[in-house]
Amino acid sequence: MVVVAAAPNPADGTPKVLLLSGQPASAAGAPAGQALPLMVPAQRGASPEAASGGLPQARKRQRLTHLSPEEKALRRKLKNRVAAQTARDRKKARMSELEQQVVDLEEENQKLLLENQLLREKTHGLVVENQELRQRLGMDALVAEEEAEAKGNEVRPVAGSAESAALRLRAPLQQVQAQLSPLQNISPWILAVLTLQIQSLISCWAFWTTWTQSCSSNALPQSLPAWRSSQRSTQKDPVPYQPPFLCQWGRHQPSWKPLMN
């Protein structure tokens, strides 16, 4: 057991008293259960700034030459116990902080899930309402289109009106019908002109192919006699072939090396 008694006034030079007791004391020769008083001298030469409560100076490491091995072991054990307890306290505080963070995050997650569910329900209701409005506006657009065709050339509604919005929100089937309507309005005489142009192109192409074939067949017999005459002239007067000049190999050559038998 270690008991530390601090001095009442740190400015005084009174020493501190350490009472050490335990099993090592009996091993050293002292009676068991008897405390060993130890006088530790206080810090001498303290500056007036430290005595008056000013900035503390850097404390030098105290030498333990005046302590016995048993006292040093007890001091080391005490320091280890204090350090372990401090580490446990820090770990416990950290774990409590993390647990509180987990609880807060779970509460926030539950709030977000509830808000997400409400937003999904609201979105579903808006989608259903949007589909109903699209259907209503599509029927109104058909009625307005029929009225516009019956009246003829009238002033079209300005952009941003209810009728223009209805025309933009028509069903896909109505859009397909609107795309096919220009093809149905083509007059028959335009189709007739297109067919006549296609027929004229076909006839021109047929005439061109027959004319080129006839020209090629007429030019072939005229070119055959000329080709045959040129072949005969080359056969009658052939160009004399002169063999290349071959330099003889002998002693006059610089690389002449006869074989020695």
Curated annotation (Swiss-Prot):
Basic motif: annotated span: 72-94
Necessary for the translational pausing of its own mRNA, as annotated region: 235-261
Protein's UniProt name: X-box-binding protein 1
Family: Belongs to the bZIP family.
Gene Ontology CC: cytoplasm; cytosol; endoplasmic reticulum; endoplasmic reticulum membrane; nucleoplasm; nucleus; RNA polymerase II transcription regulator complex
Chain residue ranges for the region called Leucine-zipper: 98-133
Disease connection: Major affective disorder 7: A major psychiatric disorder that is characterized by severe mood swings, with fluctuation between two abnormal mood states (manic or major depressive episode). Mania is accompanied by symptoms of euphoria, irritability, or excitation, whereas depression is associated with low mood and decreased motivation and energy.
Cytoplasmic membrane side: 1-185
Transmembrane segments: 186-203
InterPro entries: bZIP, bZIP_sf, ER_Stress-Reg_TF
Residue numbers marked as site, Cleavage: L194, T195
Induction text: Isoform 1 is up-regulated at the recovery phase of the endoplasmic reticulum (ER) stress response and isoform 2 is up-regulated early during the ER stress response and gradually decreased at later phase of ER stress. Isoform 1 and isoform 2 are down-regulated by laminar flow but up-regulated by disturbed flow in umbilical vein endothelial cells in vitro (at protein level). Down-regulated by the B-cell-specific transcription factor PAX5. Up-regulated by interleukin IL-6 in myeloma cells.
One term of GO molecular function: nuclear estrogen receptor binding
Post-translational modification note: X-box-binding protein 1, cytoplasmic form and luminal form are produced by intramembrane proteolytic cleavage of ER membrane-anchored isoform 1 triggered by HM13/SPP in a DERL1-RNF139-dependent and VCP/p97-independent manner. X-box-binding protein 1, luminal form is ubiquitinated leading to proteasomal degradation.
